[in-house]
Design a protein with these regions (language model features):
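Acidic metal-coordinating catalytic centers involved in nucleic-acid phosphodiester chemistry
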Residues: 68-253
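Generic preference for hydrophobic/aromatic residues in regular secondary structure cores
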Residues: 4, 9, 29-35, 139, ...
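Interdomain/boundary linker segments immediately adjacent to catalytic/signaling cores
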Residues: 1-12, 167-178, 262-272, 276-277
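Extended, amphipathic alpha-helical scaffolds
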Residues: 225-305
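Short, surface-exposed loop/strand segments
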Residues: 1-98
Length: 305
């Protein structure tokens, strides 16, 4: 399932990320339950003061709201049943501490009915094993937004890398977007058609135009994610881009061609890797380098006069 902070993650990847987040928040008080037991008990881990945790990321990338709700609802039902069945074994793990809350941690949810389902399951738990849980026991729905501080800490500590959003647009989607961003497309096309290698070949010119436009649109998705989830890192990337932009503008004044453009992109990517390779995965940095070229071409810094 797609996450805002780490792009597309498998169920196992999400579990690994969650365990790091739990360790960051609860320190040594958080204990992982080995998978061969956790799968049977309906918990990923626990704390000694009575918090239980379960992580869940559905396999597919795109869901309707109804489908996502049904998957998450059924997972909660299944694991709460395991919790009820194995409560005595779970109590052995956390020194017979009564259970305070059960945390269901998923990348996102978008249906209020999931809250209602949790309230029903809380009543079932109180009826079935009320002597082993607190009177105010709750099923807590949590997403990555519940752990923003921990995500920032782990990224800055270089324990986790920021992943690409992996957002990719089809040709039809690009055509549709270009209708609202027509000025950008026209600027890119106007500059590219000054090149001898492109101006005589309309088909190739169109392909290059939409390739650069793709770099721009998909790169903007990456920047939006960074600005929202990692504002400090976004500011650092922006400062680097602005400093390189001045050099690019000077090179453009002396005249550049497609080979020069490729060299500028590689040099910028190298600068990105020097400063951010420990905290950003390489595909994200590649997308940012491509976005910069497209952005500079859509504005003023790069021209082929």
């Amino acid at each position: 399932m797609r996450t805002e902070s780490f792009g597309e993650l498998s169920g196992q990847d999400w579990e690994d990320v969650c365990n790091k987040l739990f360790h960051a928040r609860y320190k040594d008080n958080y204990q992982e339950v080995p998978a061969r037991y956790g799968g049977d008990y309906g918990v990923e881990g626990f704390t000694f003061d009575g918090q239980l945790f379960q992580c869940y990321s559905p396999k597919d990338e795109e869901f309707s709201s109804k489908t996502l709700y049904e998957l998450q609802r059924d997972k909660i039902t299944k694991d709460i049943n395991k919790l009820i069945k194995n409560i005595l074994e779970i109590r052995k793990l956390n020194k017979n501490q009564n259970i305070q809350n059960w945390h269901f941690v998923t990348p996102a949810f978008d249906n209020k009915d999931l809250h209602e389902h949790c309230r029903k399951k809380e009543e079932e738990i109180q009826t079935a094993i009320g002597q082993f849980i607190n009177n105010d026991f709750k099923i807590m729905l949590q997403t990555e937004n519940s752990y923003i501080t921990e995500i920032g800490y782990l990224v800055n500590s270089k324990i986790l890398q920021i992943q690409s959003t992996n957002k990719s647009y089809t040709e039809d989607e690009l055509q549709l977007i270009s209708q609202s961003d027509n000025e950008i497309v026209n600027k890119i096309r106007t500059k590219l058609q000054k090149l001898d290698s492109l101006k005589e070949n309309e088909n190739t010119l169109n392909k290059y135009t939409y390739l650069v436009f793709r770099f721009f649109i998909e790169g903007q998705e990456e920047l939006e994610m960074l600005n929202k989830s990692y504002p400090d890192i976004f500011q650092g990337l922006s400062r680097l881009k602005n400093s390189i932009e001045k050099k690019v503008e000077l090179k453009s004044m002396r005249g550049i061609d497609l080979k020069d453009l490729e060299k500028i992109q590689e040099e910028y990517k190298s600068d990105l890797e020097k400063g951010f390779k420990d905290i950003c995965e390489i595909s994200l940095l590649e997308n940012l380098a491509q976005e910069a070229i497209a952005d500079w071409m859509a504005r003023c810094p790069i021209d082929f006069d």
